[in-house]
Amino acid sequence: VANADEIGIEAPKNRIGDAVRTWVRSFSGFQKKALVRSAKKGDTWRFVSDEGPYLNGHDAACCPLAFLSCGMVTSYMSEIMALAEQQGVEIRKLKLIQDNYYTMQGSMMKRTMVGGAENIELQVEIDCDLDDMALNEFLVNATYASPLNGLMRGQVESLFKLSKNGAELPTAGALELDGAILPDPSDYFANAVPMAAVDGLMSKVGPTPKKEVSGGTA
């Protein structure tokens, strides 16, 4: 987004590494639009998402979890390259193939739906001079350092601040965020201007094959 300052989306205070602020607007069905601003770099990205036929969606864009999977494997790649530079390991070739599996049971309409996630499958193709034992330790240490791994290793309590039509609502059983209510983004989404067009950032290649997993469907 070229005019993030103009439309008013500001990044939160950067406490550790990076902090992001996300504005999300819901459309019909499962379609959503989001603006995400990074405190570290100041960049603002526009995302759209949808769901496929498994949730009666139109499959007009990636599902939200696809962005998580993409960010996860990108984080692993960054950590591997950073550790290689730190330890003086020359990597001549590196390719990561990651499969994420998510489960779903029950009905959203009946409020009985329960979602879950299976273990991630990460395949690493690498050409370097480390022997097998040293390479395994190197890759484990690199992927372990990913911020995503920190989120997945334990249970994290989220903090909430709720409002409706500008009036604050109680969070009930959820933990409350200590801070003021942020203003409604209103129609600022429509005023977002894209940067110079860049083709090929994402392209659709087809539906993900369904895989039977324990406890639900992928």
Where are the language model's segments positioned?
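Alpha-helical metal-binding/catalytic segments enriched in His/Glu/Asp
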Residues: 75-76
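Extended beta-strand/beta-hairpin segments
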Residues: 1-69, 82-218
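Conserved phosphate/anionic-ligand binding catalytic regions in large, soluble enzymes, centered on
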Residues: 79
